[in-house]
């Protein structure tokens, strides 16, 4: 085995790192996020960003933005973020339904790859951070390499042994690896990640960049002082810490269409979420009104 693919030794060697931004479409701008400006910051401060891409949007990517990703594969990548990104999408216990969602998401990502030429990482980032232990089995059986999430407690298991938090990834759910990602304010935990031989995985959303990238680049600069940090994709992180290569994605059959009512509900939800991101969260006054209304 290539030494670079072996699990990272604790307290020594490289620490791999990545910034994940949830939800954005591949458009020149999305909400407060401008991809070209982000790329400039990544080059100046030496970090990598992975977009948690919603498979529902597989036919909506902008060709110019796709080229930007393809031309800068050392700085930008995409992974799988749910399937339709509906509420508690992967939090239930129906294996058949969860397997259908997992397979449908991969089919859409394969179609996106076929239509745009842009590869993706067979990594799942759960919508709203919700997943069940059964969902982990469904992902494993569908051919994903790993999942990344902002917590490692499932909807049907709220406590885990302490040692599960001390590993690069937990495999407590059906022997399928789950990596923990963190928000920028969790600096003490990032230090512990380095000490325990875990990757540093930062999560944010587009609204974090309303006032520019300074807060994020300050965090990146600080992370880069913690040791031998190498920023890279989630695929590379998973392969490195698991000591195994991602399996080839088996051909997927086109998923059966949802019923009309379900399709309309999903479409409305996605458009409303995008309207919030693009027209409300980009404006301070509108954001305050929106939060007041939502309580």
Stretches found by the model and what they are:
Residues 1-28, 137-269, 273-283:
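C-terminal active-site subregion of NodB/CE4 polysaccharide deacetylases
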Residues 2-75:
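Active-site beta->alpha N-cap acidic-glycine motif
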Residues 14-16, 45-50, 74-77, 118-121, ...:
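Loop/turn elements at helix/coil->beta-strand transitions in domains of secreted/extracellular proteins
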Residues 31-41, 61-66, 95-108, 212-222:
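Well-ordered, non-membrane alpha-helical segments in soluble/globular domains
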Residues 33-37, 119, 130-134, 197, ...:
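Short, well-structured alpha-helical interface segments that form or flank functional binding sites
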Residues 41, 45, 68, 108, ...:
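Alpha-helical structural signal in soluble globular domains
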Residues 48-136, 153-159:
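Metal-dependent polysaccharide deacetylase catalytic core of the NodB/CE4 family, i.e.
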Residues 280-294:
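Conserved anion/nucleotide-ligand pocket segment
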């Amino acid at each position: 085995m290539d030494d670079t693919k072996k699990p990272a030794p604790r307290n020594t060697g490289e620490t791999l790192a990545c910034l994940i931004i949830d939800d954005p479409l591949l458009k020149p701008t999305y909400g407060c996020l401008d991809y070209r400006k982000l790329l400039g910051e990544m080059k100046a401060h030496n970090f990598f960003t992975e977009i948690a891409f919603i498979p529902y949007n597989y036919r909506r990517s902008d060709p110019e933005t796709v080229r930007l990703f393809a031309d800068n594969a050392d700085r930008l990548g995409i992974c799988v973020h749910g399937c339709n990104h509906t509420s508690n999408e992967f939090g239930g216990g129906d294996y058949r339904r969860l397997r259908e969602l997992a397979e449908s998401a991969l089919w859409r990502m394969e179609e996106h790859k076929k239509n745009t030429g842009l590869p993706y990482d067979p990594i799942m980032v759960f919508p709203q951070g919700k997943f069940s232990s059964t969902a982990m089995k469904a992902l494993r059986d569908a051919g994903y390499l790993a999942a990344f999430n902002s917590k490692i407690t499932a909807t049907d298991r709220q406590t885990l042994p302490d040692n599960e938090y001390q590993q690069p990834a937990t495999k407590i759910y059906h022997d399928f690896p789950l990596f923990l990602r963190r928000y920028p304010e969790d600096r003490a935990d990032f230090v512990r990640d380095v000490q325990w031989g875990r990757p540093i995985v930062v999560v944010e959303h587009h609204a974090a960049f309303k006032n520019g990238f300074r807060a994020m680049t300050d965090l990146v600069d600080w992370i880069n002082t913690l040791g031998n940090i190498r920023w890279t994709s989630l695929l590379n992180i998973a392969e490195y810490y698991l000591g195994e290569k991602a399996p080839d994605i088996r051909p997927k059959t086109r998923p059966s269409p949802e019923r009309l009512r379900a399709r309309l509900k999903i479409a409305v939800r996605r458009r409303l979420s995008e309207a919030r991101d693009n027209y409300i969260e980009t404006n301070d006054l509108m954001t305050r009104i929106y939060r007041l209304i939502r309580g």
